[in-house]
Amino acid sequence: MAGVKVTFMMIAALVGSNQARCHRMICKGNDMRKTIVVGLAALMALYFVGGISARHEVFPWPQLSALRKMVVAEKAAAPSRYTFDDKERLIGDESKTPVACPAQTDRTAVLLLLGQSNAANDGGQRHRSNYGARVVNAFDQRCFIAASPLLGSTDTKGEYWTLLGNHLIASGQNDSVILAPLAYSGSEVARWAKGGDLNPVLIDTMKQLQASGHRVTSVLWVQGEADLVIGTTAEAYQQRFMSMVDTLRQHGVEAPVYISIASKCLEPSNGGFKEHVPDNAIVRAQMALSKGGHGIREGVDSDALLDGDDRYDDCHIGGSGAEKVSLAWLDLLSGDRRLESSR
């Protein structure tokens, strides 16, 4: 009996010990859960505060950001031959060949090239002057032998303005061609109107040309795709375009302004639609403007001229498209020159 009693006492002690150990484990488990919950809450609070701090540039984000830059060296930008301004416009290219700007005569074409991506360096084919310094890219009161991409516009791919310059020389219409590009990919007409962020850049470009002794002979406008996508009305487009024309006139540009029929840019990858509707508000506005006087003339109808094979991504102009568009501009400018000469 005594042995049995001792055995029961030992079992009871063991059970008690296990129960105590379990209680301690439960307590530890509860403590751990509390720690996790508190930690998660703290992390969420820090995330929220950090987001507000970063968004509004208030304490402690600027201080932490500065500390990170001191402790961890920022990755240096990869070397490039290109230089861009704060609006991503190409303003430098180490491959350019600087030359003396041609003296302007009555056989010099000075083309101010305005618009969005299909007037900028987004073409599918690069071109260069076939006539050396007779076709130049004017930028910042300097001239360079014309070659894609042109200084003064966004992006670094191809363009067809240099090809147009070659055609103007080859046709005998001009002895020299000065290309003055100012085109911004994706730009709406509102950005070019008075109060828009591109209007002062336009004014500065005109002043640079004038300071170089150059008088613009034609303004070529290729834009409209962005406004179709965002739903700009025909009335609003006309008002904003005329505001830009007023800026040109107020700063001494008396040359004709050619407004292209340009509204087609397909596929969501380009910010466009799946299908194009030719009769749209932007085209109606462009047609009305070209017939409304004020020195505004109808430019190339790229919507109708170019087919699917001429746009390498259903929006931007490829090699065959560049040939078509440059020849169409040649015909327009040559025809108007003959008309003016006959008067």
For the regions a protein language model found, what residue spans apply to each?
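Short, Lys/Arg-enriched N-terminal segments with co-localized hydrophobic residues
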Residues: V4-F8, G16-D31
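N-terminal compositionally biased, intrinsically disordered segments and leader/signal-like regions
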Residues: F8-A12, I36
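Cell-envelope and extracellular/periplasmic
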Residues: G39, L46-R343
